[in-house]
Each structure stands twice: as C-alpha cells, then as structure tokens.
C-alpha cells in the first residue's frame, strides 16, 4: 500500500490559495487514480478530499494532521480540531505531541493530551498517530516520550485497539540548526 502526503500551505508552496487548492485537487486525483491507500492532507482540505473520493467511488482513506506542526496548542484546541476533522471525514488523525511541554517536564499535560485525544480518535473508529518530532529531542527523550505514549495506551485501552495507535518520528517541518536533517529524511535515520 502507498500513502501520499501534501501538507504545504499556499504560502509554503509559494502559491495563491486558489492555486494551492488546484495542486491539492491534483494530488487527491492522482491518489484516487493510482489506488493509494491513504492521503495525508491539512485539515482544511479534508472536506474537499472526501467529496472527490465519494464522487469517484474510491476506497482512498484520508489522514490529517492535528495541531500541526508545533503541537503546542491547548488540549481543548486539539480536541476541537480533531472533532472537526472527524466530522469532515478524516480516517486517520496524526496529532503532533506537545514535545516542548515534555522536554520542560510537564509530563502530566502530555499524558492527558495523549489519553484524551486517543480516546476521541478510537471512540470514533479512527487511526491515531502521535508525532514526536525526533529532531527536537535527544535519544533519551525519544525513548522516554515513546515509552510514555506506549504506557498511556497500554494502561487505558483494550489490547485489540493497540494496532490503531502509532508513534511517528517527524512532521518534516521542524527547523533544525545548520540545516541538519530533521528526522524525515534517510540521512537523519541512517
């Protein structure tokens, strides 16, 4: 199976809003025609994707990012964005974990975020992914945050739901010092 991702805003792509919508439509159409499993798009494009997929009678799934790319919004803001994405037709919710709060020792906030957002996603039969942004963390923090997510899931959900929850390494948007790889590239992980 292939997934495909387009997460650029119009400004990031150097396009007008209308031009970026056309690019997104082309991206969605290609995924439909090539029978990809899932597309990953920004939340404001989920309705457009759902409409195109439904009209094409396609099985293409829609993933979207929540609190992207920094992950520093409040729990209430994360939940509101996720609820809207679910209502708009998203199948996969990729939450950016508040890794800065974790680094600053606010583990309880991160636990609550992981538990509450995962509950929302799983209750709505969605795949839930937690992006931890490894370029912003040292090796010890990567292990600790990944373990924290695992422990929250294992302690609070039935085993049959475990395959619906993932940890992802990177948004691909993290700005590193000296232009070093940000975790979303082969050189960063080899």
Regions found by a protein language model. Give the residues of each.
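Alpha/beta enzyme core
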Residues: 1-34, 38, 44-190
């Amino acid at each position: 199976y292939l997934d495909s991702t387009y997460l650029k805003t119009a400004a990031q792509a150097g396009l007008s809003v209308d031009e970026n919508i056309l690019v997104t439509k082309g991206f969605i159409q290609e995924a439909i025609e090539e029978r990809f499993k899932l597309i990953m798009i920004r939340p404001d494009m989920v309705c457009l994707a759902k409409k195109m997929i439904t009209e094409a009678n396609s099985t293409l799934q829609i993933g979207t990012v929540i609190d992207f790319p920094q992950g520093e919004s409040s729990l209430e803001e994360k939940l509101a964005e996720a609820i809207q994405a679910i209502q708009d037709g998203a199948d996969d919710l990729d939450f950016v974990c508040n890794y800065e709060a974790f680094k600053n020792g606010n583990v309880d906030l991160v636990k609550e975020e992981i538990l509450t957002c995962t509950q929302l996603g799983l209750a709505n039969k969605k795949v839930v992914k937690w992006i931890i942004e490894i370029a912003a963390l040292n090796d010890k923090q990567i292990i600790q945050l990944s373990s924290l997510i695992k422990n929250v899931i294992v302690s609070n959900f039935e085993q049959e739901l475990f395959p619906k929850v993932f940890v992802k390494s990177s948004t691909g948007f993290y700005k590193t010092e000296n232009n070093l790889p940000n975790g979303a590239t082969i050189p960063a992980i080899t």
